Amino acid sequence: MQNNNILVVGGAGYIGSHTCLQLAAKGYQPVVYDNLSNGHEEFVKWGVLEKGDIRDRQRLDEVLARHKPRAILHFAAMIEVGESVKDPAAFYDNNVIGTLTLLSAALAAGIDAFVFSSTCATYGLPDSVPMDESHKQAPINPYGRTKWICEQALKDYGLYKGLRSVILRYFNAAGADFEGRIGEWHEPETHAIPLAIDAALGRREGFKVFGTDYDTRDGTCVRDYIHVLDLADAHVRAVDYLLEGGESVALNLGTGTGTTVKELLDAIEKVAKRPFNIGYAERREGDSTTLVANNDKARQVLGWEPQYDLAAITESAWNWHSRRNQGG
């Protein structure tokens, strides 16, 4: 009988762990490969943990030989845009060299199904909104460029090596498992929803809004927040698609609905049932006015349909963060 092992690289992290939950629910056997630099061992609840770095070819070969996965899901990456500007070398080393090492190991092991976590940051500043997959890719920071380079490698490996891949370009991942088993946990935290919830919980002095003079309905930036379980569902569908013989494709993952920063803060205040201190500052360099996905292609190719709205995102995030003790 064919095994149902799926290697989830970076599976101890935020999106990876939620995808393991969904894979297990659909009858797959997740095998987590993670160096735990950003992941959490306690998030590995739906399969074994193989500790290792994506730049360690020997370790990758061992794990692939042991588990013989049918497909690889690759989440492992450094993701903080500000850090990528301060230390681009670390991002190129981890994100690009790490991905190329993983791809070489996959090809050597005869694995031709690969799902890659990419980002709307590969598009850069939007020419039009909502953005579809034909939008030009002109990333504006090292983080976005490392992901774009990996996308080019995947296309070439597909053309010349027979590797089939689904590239998933996320918009703003948010929310948590509704049972509170896993959730968003970054150190340091830079994402808007956890920061605002921490402000509401009194764990930080307040929340800072960068820019109130954007050309939007209330002057603050618009973003497309997508529930992490909707992202996870798309990854499982991408595995199904590849294992059924699907061809390489790049897909946006967003809801197609934009939320302003002020609307997001109102939603968090509603679920927190308390006001919190909000400060205002100048715009941050590189922040786009509006980033919203056109997700028609993902719906068409994967039969995927986002299930959760902003209320579900903020409620599940509040549930997770309010239960968690500060600092873990």
UniProtKB/Swiss-Prot annotation:
Enzyme Commission number(s) of this protein: 5.1.3.2
UniProt KW keywords: Carbohydrate metabolism, Exopolysaccharide synthesis, Galactose metabolism, Isomerase, NAD, Plasmid
Highest taxon listed in the record's lineage: Bacteria
Enzyme class: isomerase
Keyword NAD in annotation: yes
Active site: Y143 (proton acceptor)
Catalysed reaction, written as an equation: UDP-alpha-D-glucose = UDP-alpha-D-galactose
Annotated coiled-coil segments of the chain: none
Identification of the protein by name: UDP-glucose 4-epimerase
Biological process annotations from GO: galactose catabolic process via UDP-galactose, Leloir pathway; polysaccharide biosynthetic process
Swiss-Prot/TrEMBL cofactor(s): NAD(+)
Binding site for substrate: T119
Organism annotation: Rhizobium meliloti (strain 1021)
UniProt keyword annotation of NAD present: yes
Gene Ontology MF: a single term: UDP-glucose 4-epimerase activity
Family as reported in the entry's similarity comment: Belongs to the NAD(P)-dependent epimerase/dehydratase family.
Pathway the protein contributes to: Carbohydrate metabolism; galactose metabolism; Glycan metabolism; exopolysaccharide biosynthesis
